UniProtKB/Swiss-Prot annotation:
Transmembrane parts of this sequence: 8-28, 45-65, 69-89, 119-139, 155-175, 197-217
Periplasmic membrane side: 1-7, 66-68, 140-154, 218-221
Pfam families, per the entry: MarC
Primary gene name: marC
Name of this chain's protein: UPF0056 inner membrane protein MarC
Keywords of this entry: Cell inner membrane, Cell membrane, Membrane, Transmembrane, Transmembrane helix
The keyword Protease is annotated on this UniProt entry: no
Length: 221
């Protein structure tokens, strides 16, 4: 049981900086201004469900996609590392606020004409929460844990769905309490947290690239 908690904790530490629910909260507040409370709650729930589904598909079908297109594990690590590092750099040195992003502007225009527009899948679930970096991390991690013997087989079966479920629940709770979070943390607080998470992502991305290069060297050495 202790191994299960360790696996879940490790998974959350890896995924939460990538998913970054606080930036999704800022985006949600920019898009849901014309929605009533019931509609905001519905969009929050649907976004969380979509995030859970995307992560599950990435974990269990990611290897099949890699095999279909002939993508190697080192190649995935390097590509995923580049994506994660790029996302981290953008969070460290933001060029525009989340509410000013093209997705937010286009969706805001749609909301003016259609108050009940669906923003749960795009952009809240993808690419804001379960974006390319998150998906690449999940696929690469799935390949790594299946090849290692760090955890028991039953832990590797139970932990991933629980991790994805907890990420979805954290996102749902953050979106449901988005107004309170903004009042408590403030825009400056969210920017500071985003920059800290961005630095962590840059470090993770660089380590991904290093691991991929080392695997290539071992393969051809």
């Amino acid at each position: 049981m202790l191994d299960l908690f360790k696996a879940i904790g490790l998974g959350l530490v890896v995924l939460l900086p990538l998913a970054n629910p606080l930036t999704t909260v800022a985006l949600f507040l920019g898009l849901a201004g014309n929605m009533n409370s019931a509609e905001r709650n519905r969009q929050s729930l649907m976004a969380s469900v979509y995030v859970f589904a995307i992560m599950m598909v990435a974990y269990y079908a990611g290897q099949l996609v890699m095999d279909t297109f002939g993508i190697s594990i080192p190649g995935l690590r390097i590509a995923g590392g580049l994506i994660v590092a790029f996302i981290g750099f953008r969070m460290l040195f933001p060029q525009q606020k989340a509410i000013d992003s093209p997705e937010a502007k286009s969706k805001s225009e749609e909301l003016e004409d259609e108050p009940s527009a669906n923003i749960a899948f795009v952009p809240l679930a993808m690419p804001s929460t379960a974006g390319p970096g998150t998906i690449a991390m999940i696929i690469s991690s799935a390949s790594t844990v299946r090849q290692s013997s760090t955890f028991a087989d039953w832990v590797l079966m139970v932990a991933p769905p629980l991790i994805f479920f907890l990420v979805a629940v954290i996102l749902w709770g953050s979106l449901r309490s988005s107004g309170a979070i903004m009042r408590l943390v403030g825009k400056g607080g969210i920017e500071a947290i985003s920059r800290l998470m961005g630095f962590l992502l840059v470090c993770m991305g660089v380590q991904f690239i290093i691991n991929g290069i080392l695997e290539i060297i071992k393969t051809y050495h």
